Amino acid sequence: MATSTNSQDDAALSAAQAAALYRLMTWLSPAFPVGAFSYSSGIEWAVEAGDVVDAPTLQAWLAAMLSHGTGFCDAVLLAHAHRAVISNDDDALRSLAELACAYVSSRERHLETTAQGRAFVEIARAAWANGRLERAVADCAGLTAYPVAVGIVSAAHGVPLAATLHGFLHAVVSNWISAGARLIPLGQTDSQRLIAALEPAVIATGARALIASLDDLGGATFRADLASLQHEAQYTRLFRS
């Protein structure tokens, strides 16, 4: 039987590290009830329009959304929300919460991000309440976009920003793939291939967002933004966005 000779491999997580990992995995799990399964971020219209028809076209669509659209922008907002809570900058957090809600490209995307944000905060407060979280929620004083909510909760509980960013982007991409798989449709193996194929983009986007300023917010995914707008008038649909 092989025995590890690397002491780092065998080192146990500290109690704080284990708690942070446990909470992050819980909060960003598909089982965490924020209703993500009911939103497609416009992918449903892209399938109907013929832009997304199989695994390769879905991969290309999602890679663009991740690197140059919603994925990157949401990650930047998350990072700045996390830092505002850590630094106790109430004014910055309040301003960021307003910016995040104003920044979305369509009515349905606004519903998608604020409904999930509200659910995320409410459930986290009920199950993992603490004073810092209550203060941050009070600072927002209104609608909270999903990435801002994740940034607030993770910072309030001391979960490191870099890990939170990568976990968040993985969760977002996984939900997009799940929506695409139901619409095209795709099998489970193809879905996992897509998750594997998008791993480099998730890592790169998280790294970019970690050092980005709010001036870097912006996208180049006009077709995806149009899909989100067109979905509002789509006659037959499974998803809310």
Swiss-Prot record:
A Pfam entry, by short name: UreF
Cysteine pairs bridged by disulfides in the record: none
Main localisation: cytoplasm
One GO MF term attached to the UniProt entry: nickel cation binding
Annotated compartments: Cytoplasm
Chain segments annotated as coiled-coil in the UniProt record: none
Keywords: Chaperone, Cytoplasm, Nickel insertion
InterPro entries reported in the protein's UniProt record: UreF, UreF_sf
One GO cellular component term: cytoplasm
Keyword Cytoplasm: yes
Keyword flag Transferase: no
Subunit (UniProt): UreD, UreF and UreG form a complex that acts as a GTP-hydrolysis-dependent molecular chaperone, activating the urease apoprotein by helping to assemble the nickel containing metallocenter of UreC. The UreE protein probably delivers the nickel.
Role description: Required for maturation of urease via the functional incorporation of the urease nickel metallocenter.
PANTHER family: UREASE ACCESSORY PROTEIN F
Recorded family membership: Belongs to the UreF family.
Name the record gives this protein: Urease accessory protein UreF
Native source organism of the sequence: Rhodopseudomonas palustris (strain BisB18)
